């Protein structure tokens, strides 16, 4: 008489059939794989900017965002107009080409969006927002947070930083399929010289204290529509810090009209008030190798064996 498997036997066997646990690697925020970064508005290499997020409304990319921990992303207030319904937003993480989602990319709803109270319209102060993901993510090489600067992290004028996004390559154009993430190196410009450029036809101050500019006097290279809310990251001691949030500009890549960003360092207290356990400066994290940020689970062979055992009961 042959032996029979009971449900209790199967339950006892399953833990033995688990995939080897992925215990993760201890690392820090603001780290990306070694990639060649090309100056001048080019396709970003895979894995170059793992904190880049696509904010989508009704399945259409509208803004960028930056992953800052397992649950929160940083973006621009104008990406969340008052009439918009939160349930129609999705955050896409770990993706380089929006038209062809890569294995390991995530598409998550938002559970909360919070714009700063100072924001009153295009070009105003306070164009910064926080959005909470529908569930926490597990960090993988494709999905990692940028570092938030602390009070001691400063980036002087002339610092070469990078802006990334899926925005228009030129004003009025759409990024063609497969909608590959774009990257551009830009030098920082202090608010006062930048304001002087923008005030040539106006006596009113345009660049406020919570803003920073980045770009080139000759134009031709800049962030544009669709890049809004995305990260301006600068490197310090080998780590990438989110220094700015793409906010506004006059046209796209026009001479003497650099891009204008909200300076993240001006809103550290606000971020700390609304993001539980927000951490600034260098933060240690654990990165897992599993795609999609999922926890370790049964190996495929284990699932097949369990199904076979159930059939012969």
Task: Give the residues covered by each predicted segment.
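Extracellular trypsin-like serine protease catalytic domains
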Residues: 34, 38, 52-58, 164, ...
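Active-site substrate-binding loop(s) of clan PA
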Residues: 117-120, 136-185
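Conserved H-D interstitial segment of serine endopeptidase catalytic domains
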Residues: 31-37, 73-77, 81-121, 191-193, ...
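A structural motif
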Residues: 53, 73-75, 129-133, 160-165, ...
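Protease-domain processing segments flanking chymotrypsin-fold serine proteases, especially trypsin-like
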Residues: 1-69, 73-74, 90, 95, ...
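Conserved, non-catalytic sequence blocks in retroelement Pol enzymes and Pol-derived host proteins
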Residues: 40-45, 119-123, 203-205
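Conserved active-site neighborhood of the chymotrypsin/trypsin-like protease fold
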Residues: 73-77, 125-150
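Short, charged beta-turn/beta-strand-edge "cap" motif at the junction between a beta-strand
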Residues: 20, 79-81, 167-169
């Amino acid at each position: 008489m042959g032996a029979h498997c009971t449900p209790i036997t199967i339950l006892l066997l399953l833990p033995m059939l688990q995939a080897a646990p992925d215990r993760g690697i201890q690392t820090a925020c603001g780290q990306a794989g070694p990639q060649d970064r090309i100056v001048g508005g080019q396709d970003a290499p895979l894995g170059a900017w793992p904190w880049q997020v696509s904010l989508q409304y009704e399945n259409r990319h509208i803004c960028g965002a930056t992953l800052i921990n397992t649950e929160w992303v940083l973006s621009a207030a104008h990406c969340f107009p008052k009439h918009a319904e939160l349930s129609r937003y999705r955050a896409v993480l770990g993706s380089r080409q929006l038209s062809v989602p890569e294995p390991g990319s995530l598409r998550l709803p938002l559970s909360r969006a919070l714009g700063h109270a100072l924001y009153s319209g295009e070009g105003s102060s306070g164009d910064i927002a926080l959005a909470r993901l529908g569930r926490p993510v597990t960090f993988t090489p494709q999905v990692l947070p940028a570092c938030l600067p602390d009070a001691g992290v400063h980036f002087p004028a002339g610092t070469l930083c990078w802006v990334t996004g899926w925005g228009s390559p030129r004003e009025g154009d759409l990024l063609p399929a497969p909608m590959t993430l774009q990257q551009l190196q830009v030098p920082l410009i202090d608010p006062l010289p930048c304001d002087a450029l923008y005030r040539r036809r106006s006596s009113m101050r345009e660049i406020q204290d919570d803003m920073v500019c980045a770009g080139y006097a000759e134009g031709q290279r800049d962030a544009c529509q669709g890049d809004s809310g995305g990260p301006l990251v600068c490197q310090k001691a080998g780590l990438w810090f989110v220094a700015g949030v793409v906010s506004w500009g006059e046209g796209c890549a026009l001479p003497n009209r650099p891009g204008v960003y909200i300076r993240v360092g001006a809103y550290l207290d606000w971020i700390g008030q609304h993001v539980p356990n927000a951490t600034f400066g260098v933060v240690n994290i654990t990165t897992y190798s599993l795609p999609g940020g999922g926890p370790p689970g049964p190996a495929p062979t284990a699932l097949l064996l369990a199904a076979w055992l159930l059939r012969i009961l």
